[in-house]
Amino acid sequence: MPVAEEFQASWADEVEIDQGVLPPPSEVVENGLKIVTEYKYDNDNKKVKIVRTYKIEKRVVSKSIAKRKTWSKFGDSASDKPGPNPATTNVAEDVFMQFITSKEESQRPDDGELDGLKPPSSNVIFKCRTCQGDHLTLYCPFKHTQIAQAKTAEAAKAAEAKVAASNKYIPPSSAGRIPGRDQPPVSREDVTAIRISNLSNFAVEADIDDLVKGFGPVHKLYLAKEKSTGHCKGFAYVHFKFRADAAKAIQSLNGHGYDHLILNVEWSKPPQNN
């Protein structure tokens, strides 16, 4: 009886058979690291070994997060192990979200309502009629000085010229007054105010206070400063409580050397009443 010949496959067939089987993935956990090894074919139909190393960290999370990790997976991931599957899950950076309820959205003011609260123009500033500064005329620091006096004299002359041209009778009590305004009374501060000039550009209010506090109580002190730099303009006004103290300050400080400069101290000239 003839013996059947043993079949021997060629090496090419063996290669094709080997390509159809891939080693199973392996997972090793040691020294706080999880090493996952997988095999697959690339685009050139070559077997590729992929090794992923994960660092295991233990964190304290809330109960809701811990409970969510125990949920059973479903669909194509029903047979996956606990935790993210690298084949289907990509771990990226944390994204923080802020949820706004409909109630908060309804309470948010519209842009149209805010437009009415905005100033009409960012270039609009206050302009003083006395010194042309960026403040209200009512709060002008020069309203009792020579600048205000010159402004008042010019306004009075303009009013007199207007009255002379109209040929109307003007009561003596109203003669020389600015139309629409009453004549301001003489302030008690005017007779106790002194003007200190030729000050250093680096002088501050504390320096002026040190100069005059030895002569008597001071009611008000003003140091003129540059708007852009904040440096002293070279002069200041001091209002004493008593005129006798102001006179002593003028006598002592006028011609006095201070900060390598000679001070000029005189009475502050209030506006004259017409």
Swiss-Prot record:
<dbReference type="InterPro" id="IPR035979">
    <property type="entry name" value="RBD_domain_sf"/>
</dbReference>
<feature type="domain" description="RRM">
    <location>
        <begin position="192"/>
        <end position="270"/>
    </location>
</feature>
<dbReference type="GO" id="GO:0016282">
    <property type="term" value="C:eukaryotic 43S preinitiation complex"/>
</dbReference>
<dbReference type="Pfam" id="PF00076">
    <property type="entry name" value="RRM_1"/>
</dbReference>
<dbReference type="GO" id="GO:0033290">
    <property type="term" value="C:eukaryotic 48S preinitiation complex"/>
</dbReference>
<keyword id="KW-0963">Cytoplasm</keyword>
<comment type="similarity">
    <text>Belongs to the eIF-3 subunit G family.</text>
</comment>
<keyword id="KW-0648">Protein biosynthesis</keyword>
<dbReference type="GO" id="GO:0003723">
    <property type="term" value="F:RNA binding"/>
</dbReference>
<dbReference type="GO" id="GO:0001732">
    <property type="term" value="P:formation of cytoplasmic translation initiation complex"/>
</dbReference>
<comment type="subunit">
    <text>Component of the eukaryotic translation initiation factor 3 (eIF-3) complex.</text>
</comment>
<dbReference type="GO" id="GO:0003743">
    <property type="term" value="F:translation initiation factor activity"/>
</dbReference>
<dbReference type="InterPro" id="IPR000504">
    <property type="entry name" value="RRM_dom"/>
</dbReference>
<keyword id="KW-0694">RNA-binding</keyword>
<dbReference type="InterPro" id="IPR017334">
    <property type="entry name" value="eIF3_g"/>
</dbReference>
<dbReference type="GO" id="GO:0005852">
    <property type="term" value="C:eukaryotic translation initiation factor 3 complex"/>
</dbReference>
<keyword id="KW-0396">Initiation factor</keyword>
<comment type="function">
    <text>RNA-binding component of the eukaryotic translation initiation factor 3 (eIF-3) complex, which is involved in protein synthesis of a specialized repertoire of mRNAs and, together with other initiation factors, stimulates binding of mRNA and methionyl-tRNAi to the 40S ribosome. The eIF-3 complex specifically targets and initiates translation of a subset of mRNAs involved in cell proliferation. This subunit can bind 18S rRNA.</text>
</comment>
<dbReference type="InterPro" id="IPR012677">
    <property type="entry name" value="Nucleotide-bd_a/b_plait_sf"/>
</dbReference>
<protein>
    <recommendedName>
        <fullName>Eukaryotic translation initiation factor 3 subunit G</fullName>
    </recommendedName>
</protein>
<dbReference type="InterPro" id="IPR024675">
    <property type="entry name" value="eIF3g_N"/>
</dbReference>
<dbReference type="Pfam" id="PF12353">
    <property type="entry name" value="eIF3g"/>
</dbReference>
<dbReference type="InterPro" id="IPR034240">
    <property type="entry name" value="eIF3G_RRM"/>
</dbReference>
